[in-house]
Swiss-Prot record:
Any one biological process term the GO annotation gives: electron transport chain
Protein name per UniProt: THAP domain-containing protein 11
Keyword 4Fe-4S annotated: no
Encoding gene per record: Thap11
Additional record remark: Was named 'Ronin' (a masterless Japanese samurai) by PubMed:18585351 because of its lack of apparent relationship to known 'master' regulator of pluripotency.
Length: 305
């Protein structure tokens, strides 16, 4: 990493990364230098600091000074909040922390299972939705049959004036009463009333068909959802395939690193190409100069100069 890193064991502050901190070299005064080394080589830290001799490359960050900076009054580092490399490691968690954490995880899993069971109970089963659909189908068929019979009756009345259309029965047992179109040909007003009655009957049958379709609509949607199972995602970066957000971020960072490396390589290749072109131009110029000198030598030789 560029910049200076603090030489205190366990302290990784860096001048390039931590811009707000100050970094100091070891003092040249022998007494101050001894105090700095004594405090930096604190109790419990041994090894490299037993024979540590600071050089011009060693730096000490301002975190280890009272007030966060070395001054005329604060000249010796005395604050070392970080553990040294060889200090005794103290357990960060109490003895029963692991057991309590396991119990908490088990409780969370049980709560999640209960929530899933409640959701499953609230959702309607496929068998009940199928049964409701089959119950609504006869009503739809009967309404459709009523409309068809009414239309047929109107056509028959137009073809044979004065005839009587017989009463029909739908498959569900509902009586569909056709319109009595028995009128006298000479009464135009009676014929107009019969046509109006036929139109009103047709509208009533159409309204019944639409009501049956509206009632059936949500059930058909449920059946349609069951008929198209989820096939899963087509790529490995989808969250539904079990990939976590951390893995996605890691993969994206890897892709960004690869792209950055490719950009660096491309810049290097462009520089190499530019350098080769310059070299080629120089070689061509040298070749022209040699050809010119050779031609002049040939001319001089011919003329005996």
């Amino acid at each position: 990493m560029p910049g200076f890193t603090c030489c205190v064991p366990g302290c990784y502050n860096n001048s390039h990364r931590d811009k707000a901190l100050h970094f100091y070299t070891f003092p040249k005064d022998a007494e101050l230098r001894r105090l700095w080394l004594k405090n930096v080589s604190r109790a419990g830290v041994s090894g490299c600091f037993s024979t540590f001799q600071p050089t011009t490359g060693h730096r000490l960050c301002s975190v280890h000074f009272q007030g966060g900076r070395k001054t005329y009054t604060v000249r010796v580092p005395t604050i070392f909040p970080l553990r040294g490399v060889n200090e005794r490691k103290v357990a960060r968690r109490p003895a029963g922390a692991a057991a309590a954490r396991r119990r908490q995880q088990q409780q969370q899993q049980q709560q999640q299972q209960q929530q899933q069971q409640q959701l499953q109970q609230q959702q309607p089963s496929p068998s009940s939705s199928t049964a409701q659909t089959t119950q609504l189908q006869p009503n739809l068929v009967s309404a459709s049959a009523a409309v068809l019979l009414t239309l047929q009756a109107a056509v028959d009345s137009n073809q044979a004036p004065g005839s009587v259309v017989p009463v029909s029965t739908t498959p569900s047992g509902d009586d569909v009463k056709p319109i009595d179109l028995t009128v006298q040909v000479e009464f135009a007003a009676a014929e107009g009333a019969a046509a109006a009655a036929a139109a009103s009957e047709l509208e009533a049958a159409t309204a019944g068909l639409e009501a049956a379709e509206c009632t059936l609509g949500p059930q058909l949607v449920v059946v349609g959802e069951e008929g198209f199972p989820d096939t899963g995602s087509d790529h490995s970066y989808s969250l539904s395939s079990g990939t976590t957000e951390e893995e996605l971020l890691r993969k994206l960072n890897e892709q960004r690193d690869i792209l950055a490396l490719m950009e660096v390589k491309m810049k290097e290749m462009k520089g190499s190409i530019r350098h080769l072109r310059l070299t080629e131009a120089k070689l061509r110029e040298e070749l022209r100069e040699k050809d010119r000198l050779l031609a002049m030598a040939v001319i001089r030789k011919k003329h005996g100069m």
